[in-house]
């Protein structure tokens, strides 16, 4: 069945009801999935020859963490190259990027696929993808109808990108709450902790303040530093990295400030230090808590006065460097213990950032797992790498003391193990491919068998009644929102509620 102007109007209304970009995007694709009766839909942003999922419906959650490079996904490349609706036949030789990523149908391949490139003028900004398990699922919809859908989606995405651009240039009126970022590609995560961290990165990036980034080993502190630099006015200049923990005391001063020829044995020529290399840019000092007190004093002088002295040189050099420092230690405790200078701590922690451990990030672990699965797929030349339901359950219940780095290594190892036990270039990661110690999984919910006191019809109606009551409570008795949650038509929901005695 085709859709009417009323359907398009309802889609537009849903977009206006959304609070923030993410909510609008989710409402858009959820509504589209219902209207077009497809098995899965996704809104993707285009950036640097890759598609980045912004919102999905009907797909495994880890899709949100994947980055679909065009070189590895010929269907998406065909969509990017097209200027119009793209329909892929059921017998298309081009693999579908979502094969194995529709929950409950991991072993089946997508049969119907439509791609809608999204443009602003002549510029590609994203795509809508619609997938179904039936070969002729989208034949009833004309290209013209699908173009109208694409126009609505392109408008929503274009507005979000424009708002983000204006906000970054401080051109939005008033003191509105910052919009959530659309262009963040590296900082994967939708948990409250990561959402707050992204907002703080946007705020501090625009300034020239020194930043102290704290967090456990493997949480991604270097990625935070990179995000700050790339969003700052210094982004056109270098970001220089130095791991303080790997610096032998004998060469640490030379690494930081450079040396002149003959300053010490082996100094056969003049050499610039990291501060000179980072002039007009950013210097990232990782594991700064490992620096000796003597070097801390010299670093403090640079932060105070902006000049350095090469080892063996009496002359001072002016440098303009923003310092981002990271540590997995509690520097306040280090100050109290006399192992870190209090004055340096206060100089560095003008704007402190804390990176949450993976165990506190909820479903972010699944998004990150999807990202690493896609990386493995590309590096090893596989057609697909997907997580089984059991593997996802295991990842969600493991504490990951090594944080994101441990997850990355675990995914890479699991892919190698799974590939060794399976022929072909399709890999499904099962729970047994992960070697996590002492993971206690919750027992199955259906452990107890209830005593039957109703016939099947009464039991079904009781279940429907309670489900609708709970959905209404969660949506503040908004019937339209309740229908979206239950994935049903609002008119059908009203009729069912009347039959069940929930409405007059």
From Swiss-Prot:
List the Pfam families hit by this protein, alphabetically. Answer: GAF (PF01590), Sigma54_activat (PF00158)
Residue ranges of the annotated DNA-binding region, renumbered to this chain:
479-498
What region holds the Sigma-54 factor interaction domain? Answer: 187-416
Which residues make up the binding site for ATP? 215-222, 278-287
Phosphoprotein among the record's keywords? Answer: yes
GO MF term list: ATP binding; ATP hydrolysis activity; DNA binding; DNA-binding transcription factor activity
The pathway is: Nitrogen metabolism; nitric oxide reduction
The alphabetized UniProt keywords are: ATP-binding, DNA-binding, Nucleotide-binding, Phosphoprotein, Transcription, Transcription regulation
Offer one example of a GO biological process linked to this entry.
Answer: phosphorelay signal transduction system
According to the UniProt entry, which residues carry 4-aspartylphosphate? 57
Source organism, top-level taxon: Bacteria
Q: What does this protein do?
A: Required for the expression of anaerobic nitric oxide (NO) reductase, acts as a transcriptional activator for at least the norVW operon. Activation also requires sigma-54.
Protein's recorded name: Anaerobic nitric oxide reductase transcription regulator NorR
UniProt gene name: norR
């Amino acid at each position: 069945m085709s859709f009417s102007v009323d359907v398009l109007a309802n889609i537009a209304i849903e977009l206006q009801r959304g609070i923030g970009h993410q909510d609008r995007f989710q409402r858009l694709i959820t509504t589209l999935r219902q209207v077009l009766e497809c098995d899965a839909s996704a809104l993707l942003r285009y950036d640097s020859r890759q598609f980045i999922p912004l919102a999905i419906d009907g797909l495994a959650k880890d899709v949100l963490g994947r980055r679909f490079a065009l070189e590895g996904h010929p269907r998406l490349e065909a969509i990017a190259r097209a200027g119009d609706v793209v329909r892929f036949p059921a017998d298309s030789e081009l693999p579908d990027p979502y094969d194995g990523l529709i929950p409950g149908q991991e072993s089946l391949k997508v049969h119907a696929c439509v791609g809608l490139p999204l443009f602003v003028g002549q510029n590609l900004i994203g795509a809508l993808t619609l997938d179904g398990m039936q070969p002729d699922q989208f034949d009833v919809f004309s290209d013209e109808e699908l173009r109208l859908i694409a126009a609505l989606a392109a408008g929503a995405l274009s507005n979000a990108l424009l708002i983000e651009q204006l906000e970054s240039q401080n051109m939005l009126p008033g003191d509105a709450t910052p919009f959530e970022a659309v262009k963040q590609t590296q900082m994967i995560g939708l948990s409250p902790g990561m959402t707050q961290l992204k907002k703080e990165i946007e705020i501090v990036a625009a300034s020239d303040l020194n930043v102290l980034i704290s967090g456990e080993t493997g949480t991604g502190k270097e990625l935070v530093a990179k995000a700050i630099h790339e969003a700052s006015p210094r982004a056109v200049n270098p970001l220089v990295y130095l791991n303080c923990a790997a610096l032998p005391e004998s060469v640490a001063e030379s690494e930081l400030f450079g040396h002149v020829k003959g300053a010490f044995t082996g100094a056969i020529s003049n050499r610039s230090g990291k501060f000179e290399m980072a002039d007009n840019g950013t210097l990232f000092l990782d594991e700064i808590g490992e620096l000796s007190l003597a070097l801390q004093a010299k670093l403090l002088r640079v932060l105070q006065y902006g000049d350095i002295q090469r080892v063996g040189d009496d002359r001072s050099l002016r440098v303009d460097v923003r310092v981002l420092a990271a540590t997995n230690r509690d520097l306040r405790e280090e100050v109290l213990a006399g192992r870190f200078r209090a004055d340096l701590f206060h100089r560095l922690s003008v704007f402190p950032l804390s990176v949450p451990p993976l165990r506190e990030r909820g479903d972010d672990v699944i998004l990150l797992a999807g990202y690493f699965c896609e990386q493995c797929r590309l590096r090893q030349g596989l057609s697909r790498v997907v997580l089984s339901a059991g593997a996802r359950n295991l990842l969600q219940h493991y504490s990951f003391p090594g944080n994101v780095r441990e997850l990355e290594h675990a995914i890479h190892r699991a892919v190698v193990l799974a590939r060794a036990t399976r022929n072909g270039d399709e890999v499904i990661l099962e729970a047994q491919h992960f070697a996590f110690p002492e993971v206690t999984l919750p027992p199955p919910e259906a452990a107890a068998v209830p005593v039957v006191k109703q016939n099947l019809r009464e039991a079904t109606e009781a279940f429907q009644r309670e489900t609708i009551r709970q959905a209404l409570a969660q949506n503040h008795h908004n019937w339209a929102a309740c229908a979206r949650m239950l994935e049903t038509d609002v008119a059908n929901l009203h009729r069912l509620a009347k039959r069940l005695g929930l409405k007059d």
